Design a protein with these regions (language model features):
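Active-site glycine/GP-rich loop and adjacent strand/helix microenvironment
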Residues: 11-300
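Conserved structural elements of the adenylate-forming
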Residues: 1-8
Length: 301
């Protein structure tokens, strides 16, 4: 993924990415199976833990902070590491825009304590995860009063407009998903970004990748995704009404209302079309069949 972005943004191999990544709690199903989100599965797998070195994909967050099961400790440690390595950060982000904004809000509430950590080279006592403490302590290194003063000056300003650019001045873009339901967060991201481009690189779910944005520097309103037909078998269910109206109909599914039932019956009776028969300018609901034979209705495109 990072290789194709290198075509549009120079020098990504000359620094690090401050990507805020988290694991989620696992649950045990009635059958005794472990269920967890796909990203949690990936971060806990050997593919992530033992990934080969890639100069385009170096994180400021140690793996120990990403794999911390306590979300507050994980967030704190990842942001602290990102601040300490601010001069090396070339890109920042999270999976979703909402998650990245939660991190900014968390920083607003905790920057003073982080400055104290940097000034004294001591991790806060409430960080009790031993792996996190050890990993962050190594990154903190020696006391750094100059860095703590700089962060205090920027974060203590009356307005946080452009704070991302101020704290991480070499940042070339913010990588978060800002399409679909995440589009509502674009104005807030632009307020904090200081003019840094918002990059939405992919379209995916737990089942598979759907598409990639091959023009990553396009405006959020102009983002489009190129479908990856090798990831799953895609079919397209034509939607007669506009996107907003259809979304409302889907939300009322399962409610014992006759109009909803009629709309659902009508939807199930429609025929899907293959990719080659999709018409430009029309709306479709994506129907995905995975390699395991599981299929599901996803959402509109």
């Amino acid at each position: 993924m990072c290789i194709y972005k290198f075509r549009y943004v120079d020098g990504l191999d000359q620094g690090k990415g401050m990507y805020l990544l988290f694991i989620k709690p696992e649950i045990i199903t009635p059958a005794g199976l472990t269920a967890r989100p796909v990203l949690t599965s990936y971060y806990k797998s050997g593919n992530f833990r033992n990934r080969p070195f890639n100069r385009f994909n170096i994180y400021t967050s140690p793996d120990e902070t990403i794999l911390c099961s306590d979300s507050k400790q994980s967030m704190y440690c990842q942001l602290l590491c990102g601040l300490v390595q601010r001069d090396e950060v070339l890109r920042v982000g999270a999976v979703f825009a909402s998650a990245f904004l939660r991190a900014i809000k968390f920083l607003e509430e905790n920057w003073r304590e982080m400055c104290s950590n940097i000034r004294t080279s001591h991790v806060s006592d409430w960080i009790t995860d031993p792996s996190c403490r050890n990993a962050v302590s190594l990154i903190l290194g020696k006391p750094n009063s100059d860095l703590a003063d700089l962060i205090e000056y920027e974060c203590g300003s009356k307005s946080w407009e452009g704070i991302i650019k101020k704290l991480w001045p070499r940042t070339k873009y913010i990588e978060v998903i800002v399409t679909g339901s995440m589009a509502q967060y674009i104005p807030t991201l632009e307020f904090y970004s200081g003019g840094i481009p918002l990059v939405s690189t992919m379209y995916a779910s737990s089942e598979c990748y759907f598409g990639i944005n091959f023009k990553p520097l396009s405006k959020p309103s102009d983002v489009s995704y190129t479908l990856l037909p090798n990831m799953a078998y895609f079919e397209f269910l034509p939607v007669e009404k506009n996107h907003e109206e259809m979304s409302e109909e889907i939300q009322c599914n399962g409610v014992s209302d006759q109009n909803c039932i009629q709309e659902e019956d009508k939807r199930e009776g429609m025929q899907t079309v293959d990719l080659v028969d999709v018409k430009l300018g029309h709306y479709y609901e994506l129907v995905v069949t995975t390699s395991t034979g599981i299929f599901f209705f996803f959402l509109q495109i």
